[in-house]
Amino acid sequence: MPVAQHRLASFVTRQWQRRGWFARMLWPLSLLFGAVSGLRRRLFRWGWLRSVRLPVPVVVVGNVTVGGAGKTPAVIALASALADAGLRPGIVSRGYGAQLKHPRPVREHSRAEDVGDEPLLIARATDLPVWVYPDRVLCAQTLLASHPGCNVIVCDDGLQHYRLRRDIEIVVFDLRMGGNGFLLPAGPLREPMTRRRDATLINDPNYRATHDRPDIYGMRLDLQDAYNLADPALRRPLSQFARLSGDQLLAAAGIGNPERFFASLRAAGLQPATLPLPDHYDFADNPFADAGAETILITEKDAVKCGHLDDPRIWVVPTTPVVDAALVEQVCRRVRALADRSTSQAGAQ
């Protein structure tokens, strides 16, 4: 089933990069989708649908495209930068795949099935307060009540959650950008490429080769030494896996764009066989049970769901997200000014 799901997803993704028969066939539905979503945006803009402003600044980091573009590492990098600048960020997320009846905090030992894989990864990577619930407003309000020292909210995804007012919007793309430029389902876009945003962040270090606008910034993901899933204290530089041939080394990824992970390993000098899995794959069963590989490399996002797998062949490849310093400086400066203003207004009341 995972292979069939990935093949279908890969087919759709390929079609979304061109304006062929698939896109033309679905284009009328895209017009309908655009009309409905556009009306909803306008209702919030005109005040017919109520939005809520929090007592602290809100930074939303998200996608206007379907599929993995690098949103989670961008959230980790920007939230960590805000904390390093002396601010006290809290992070809210939907908690994809979790059955949530109320806002819930993400703890170090939370389970991915209870809070979502991406929020758990964010919490472990940042050591900051992370709460999950589909209603971002209620989620953020609960976080602020539980962490009164928090003075900025970073919203993981939620660009289309207009009920939550935001001060800064950062839209993340990879090099595929908006694909064929069509809205769903004929293309990958949830909203038009022309939607308002404060900054565009492209998950590719060579973005300047094709984009030179001043409001476009880049991000890269630096691979770190791998650690063994069963024994995290055991670490190896990736170069030690270069001696393994394709049938001995397997790379697997259940993320939005598995090929990006595989390409980064090849760029590091490895030549693994590859096993793409559906995004948010739950690893209820061991997909590697019948694999003959000596070593299996997986992503950090997948690792938070694989703790129960008793397989010493599995190694986790961490990444360190590095965002353009200019964007980090701009966001920190604006958030600090907004936070100071919020504090002054609260003191005057």
Swiss-Prot record:
It catalyses: a lipid A disaccharide + ATP = a lipid IVA + ADP + H(+). The keyword ATP-binding applies. ATP binds at residues 65-72. Belongs to the LpxK family. This is Tetraacyldisaccharide 4'-kinase. One of its GO terms (cellular component) is plasma membrane. SUPFAM superfamilies: P-loop containing nucleoside triphosphate hydrolases. InterPro entries: LpxK, P-loop_NTPase. Pathway: Glycolipid biosynthesis; lipid IV(A) biosynthesis; lipid IV(A) from (3R)-3-hydroxytetradecanoyl-[acyl-carrier-protein] and UDP-N-acetyl-alpha-D-glucosamine: step 6/6. The keyword ATP-binding applies. The gene is lpxK. Keywords: ATP-binding, Kinase, Lipid A biosynthesis, Lipid biosynthesis, Lipid metabolism, Nucleotide-binding, Transferase. One of its GO terms (molecular function) is tetraacyldisaccharide 4'-kinase activity.
